[in-house]
C-alpha cells in the first residue's frame, strides 16, 4: 500500500480528528466531507475500531503493514498492548522531531529526517521510522541550522509545549530523550483499546 499523500484536511474530516495540528480548515468543518457529511450514521463496533486504527495510522504517517508489525511487537511486550503501541509510535524519530518543535507537522518532520538533516548520537540517521531510546541525543547538522525550517524552529521555540520526556537545548536545537513516554504524556486523541480490539478479532 502506498503512503497517503492526498489532501490531509479531507482525511482529517473523514476520521473526525485533526491529523495536522492547528488545521483551521478542519476546525471550521469538523464533519465528514461530501454531500451527506453532516448526516448521522449509525456506527458499528467494527467501524469504530477501524476508524480508531486509521486515526493512529494517519496521525503518525505509518503504512498498514508497518502498523501491523508495531501492533505485534506491542502485543509481545509486557504491559498493556495499547500503551505499548503508542509508546512505539511516539518513539519514531520523525515524531520526536515534531514533538520537539523542530517541525510544524509530522509530514515536515519526516522530510527533514529523510533529507539527512538530523544526527542521533553524532551519527546521521535518515530513516523516519528509526526508534529513539532513553538518553539518546538528537542534533541538527551544523550546516542545516541555517536552513529555513530550523530558523523558524528557533524563532518559534516556546510556542508549542514540549512533552516532559524530551528536552530541547537552546539555539542549537539539541533534543535530549530523558525517557520514553508514559501514557499520560501522550496527548493524541486516540482510544488505543479500540485498536487492540480491532486486531484481536
UniProtKB/Swiss-Prot annotation:
- SMART domains (alphabetical): Ribosomal_S4 (SM01390), S4 (SM00363)
Cellular component aspect of the GO annotation: small ribosomal subunit
InterPro entries of this UniProt entry?
A: Ribosomal_uS4 (IPR022801), Ribosomal_uS4_bac-type (IPR005709), Ribosomal_uS4_CS (IPR018079), Ribosomal_uS4_N (IPR001912), S4_RNA-bd (IPR002942), S4_RNA-bd_sf (IPR036986)
Segments traversing the membrane: none
Which terms in the Gene Ontology molecular function aspect does this entry carry?
A: rRNA binding; structural constituent of ribosome
Q: Which UniProt keywords apply?
A: Ribonucleoprotein, Ribosomal protein, RNA-binding, rRNA-binding
S4 RNA-binding domain span: 91-155
* A Pfam family the protein falls into: Ribosomal_S4
Which PROSITE patterns does the record cross-reference, listed alphabetically?
RIBOSOMAL_S4 (PS00632), S4 (PS50889)
Task: Give yes or no: UniProt keyword Ribosomal protein.
Answer: yes
Enumerate the Gene Ontology biological process terms.
ribosomal small subunit biogenesis; translation
Looking at the record's lineage, which domain of life comes first? Bacteria
HAMAP family linked? Ribosomal_uS4_B
Outline the subunit composition: Part of the 30S ribosomal subunit. Contacts protein S5. The interaction surface between S4 and S5 is involved in control of translational fidelity.
Family, as annotated:
Belongs to the universal ribosomal protein uS4 family.
Summarize the protein's role. One of the primary rRNA binding proteins, it binds directly to 16S rRNA where it nucleates assembly of the body of the 30S subunit. With S5 and S12 plays an important role in translational accuracy.
Q: What is this protein called?
A: Small ribosomal subunit protein uS4
Amino acid at each position: 500500500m502506498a503512503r497517503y499523500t492526498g489532501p490531509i484536511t479531507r482525511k482529517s474530516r473523514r476520521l473526525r480528528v485533526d491529523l495536522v495540528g492547528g488545521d483551521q480548515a478542519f476546525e471550521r468543518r469538523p464533519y465528514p466531507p461530501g454531500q451527506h457529511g453532516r448526516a448521522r450514521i449509525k456506527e458499528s463496533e467494527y467501524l469504530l475500531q477501524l476508524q480508531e486504527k486509521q486515526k493512529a495510522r494517519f496521525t503518525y504517517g505509518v503504512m498498514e503493514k508497518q502498523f501491523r508489525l508495531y501492533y505485534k511487537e506491542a502485543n509481545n511486550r509486557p504491559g498493556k498492548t495499547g500503551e505499548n503501541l503508542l509508546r512505539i509510535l511516539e518513539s519514531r524519530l520523525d515524531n520526536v522531531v515534531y514533538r520537539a518543535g523542530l517541525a510544524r507537522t509530522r509530514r515536515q518532520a519526516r522530510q527533514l529526517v529523510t533529507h539527512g538533516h538530523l544526527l542521533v548520537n553524532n551519527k546521521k540517521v535518515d530513516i523516519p521510522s528509526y526508534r529513539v531510546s532513553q538518553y539518546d541525543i538528537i542534533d541538527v547538522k551544523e550546516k542545516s541550522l541555517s536552513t529555513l525550517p530550523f530558523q523558524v524552529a528557533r524563532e518559534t521555540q516556546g510556542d508549542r509545549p514540549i512533552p516532559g520526556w524530551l528536552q530541547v537545548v537552546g539555539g542549537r536545537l539539541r533534543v535530549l530523550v530523558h525517557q520514553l513516554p508514559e501514557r499520560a504524556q501522550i496527548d493524541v486523541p486516540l482510544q488505543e483499546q479500540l485498536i487492540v480490539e480491532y486486531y484481536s478479532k
